[in-house]
Amino acid sequence: MAVKDYYKVQGDSVTRIKQFCPRCGPGTFLADHKNRLTCGKCGYTEFKK
């Protein structure tokens, strides 16, 4: 996935689409699966409701 898929540009502002991993910190994004968010680096998993 390219970096452009992690951010959304609207006019002069840039917003982050994906969440950062709370364990690894900024720069490591969580993968968005059907029922969970997962970090590929440390294995952190957060289930969706």
Curated annotation (Swiss-Prot):
It comes from the Archaea. GO terms for biological process: translation. The keyword Cell cycle does not apply. A zinc finger (C4-type) spans 21-42. SUPFAM superfamilies: Zn-binding ribosomal proteins (SSF57829). Its cofactor is Zn(2+). Zn(2+) binds at residues 21, 24, 39, 42. One of its GO terms (cellular component) is ribonucleoprotein complex. Binds 1 zinc ion per subunit. Keywords: Metal-binding, Ribonucleoprotein, Ribosomal protein, Zinc, Zinc-finger. One of its GO terms (molecular function) is zinc ion binding. Part of the 30S ribosomal subunit. Belongs to the eukaryotic ribosomal protein eS31 family. NCBIfam families: PRK00432.1 (NF001669). This is Small ribosomal subunit protein eS31. It comes from Methanosarcina barkeri (strain Fusaro / DSM 804).
